[in-house]
Design a protein with these regions (language model features):
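Perimembrane helix-loop-helix junctions
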Residues: 4, 179, 206-234
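Membrane-interface transmembrane helices that cradle and orient dolichyl/undecaprenyl
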Residues: 129-134, 170-186, 196
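Short helix- or helix-capping micro-motifs
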Residues: 25-28, 140-145, 172, 193-197
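Short acidic/glycine- and proline-prone juxtamembrane loop motifs at membrane-interface regions
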Residues: 149-163
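Hydrophobic alpha-helical membrane-interfacial segments at the cytosolic entry of transmembrane helices
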Residues: 17-24, 187-192, 220-236
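Transmembrane-helix signature of polytopic, membrane-embedded enzymes
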Residues: 96-103, 124-146, 164-165
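Extracytosolic helix-loop segments that constitute the early lumenal/periplasmic catalytic or substrate-binding loops
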Residues: 30-42, 46-77, 81, 89-97
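Transmembrane-helix motifs of polytopic, lipid-linked glycan transferases
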Residues: 103, 107-131, 169
Length: 236
């Protein structure tokens, strides 16, 4: 009978360790989102009622009334993209289960945060792959996978997880555009910035890096038309 030996070095290569950290980080985020109610460690949730002025009310007004808040009071000043996606997720869950309880609908909205947090981890690994050695990528993924400030947002109702996703996406998109400044990458980057700015205004910060890369490559083919299309898509 052939003897089987477990080769630790062959199994736990640096690349496999990075993959393991990524999978572990995603499992942690999903587990936390499932077991933690939205009112625990939440931020600016307030009452689970359409008559309140917190993030829960923002979502519930979209689900129940089918429209954005009529004012910018308190948490109603937030950009709408995250809440539109969360309202869609909550409406789908309501349709599948028939449950119309406010707590259930608000908790269902966390699905967007959880998915965004997991995809943020993937995009972060892609960015680390661009700039770092495999050993440094391992350290970076360990920090991103298990530091509470990153995975807690995956179990909360709020735009933070989606904002981090778009920040990672636009930086990676800028890196890809610099390598291949074609129409496809220009339009994709513009869409990412447009959606990101509709999620949170702080997406303006990575724009400085993107502007620098654009300026470096201003002599590339058809630069002016690409920038015009980029502005038309991203700025509104």
């Amino acid at each position: 009978m052939r003897e089987y030996r477990f080769d630790v070095k062959r199994c736990f290569t640096p690349e496999n360790v990075v993959r393991l950290l990524f999978v572990s980080g995603c499992i942690l985020r999903i587990w936390y989102a499932v077991v933690t109610p939205v009112t625990m460690r939440g931020h600016d949730i307030w009452e689970l009622s359409v008559n309140a002025k917190g993030k829960a009310a923002y979502l519930l007004r979209l689900v129940e009334w089918g429209k954005l808040p009529d004012s910018y009071e308190l948490q109603f000043y937030q950009q709408p993209f995250y809440y539109l996606l969360s309202a869609l997720a909550a409406a789908v869950m309501r349709g599948l289960t028939g449950i119309e309880d406010a707590a259930f609908l608000v908790n269902a909205g966390k699905v967007v945060s959880c998915i965004a947090s997991c995809f943020s981890l993937y995009l972060s690994e892609r960015l680390l792959r661009e700039f770092c050695s495999v050993r440094v990528r391992g350290y970076g993924m360990a920090v991103l996978s298990f530091t509470p400030v990153f995975w807690l947002t995956g179990g909360r109702l709020g735009e933070d997880a989606l904002t981090f996703f778009f920040m990672a996406a636009v930086i990676l998109g800028t890196v890809e555009w610099e390598k291949q400044p074609d129409w496809k990458h220009s339009i994709l980057l513009a869409v990412l910035y447009g959606c990101g700015m509709m999620t949170k205004i702080s997406l303006a910060f990575p724009a400085f890096y993107t502007a620098y890369i654009f300026w470096k490559n201003r002599k590339s083919s058809r630069f002016i038309p690409k920038m015009a299309v980029f502005a038309v898509i991203a700025l509104p």
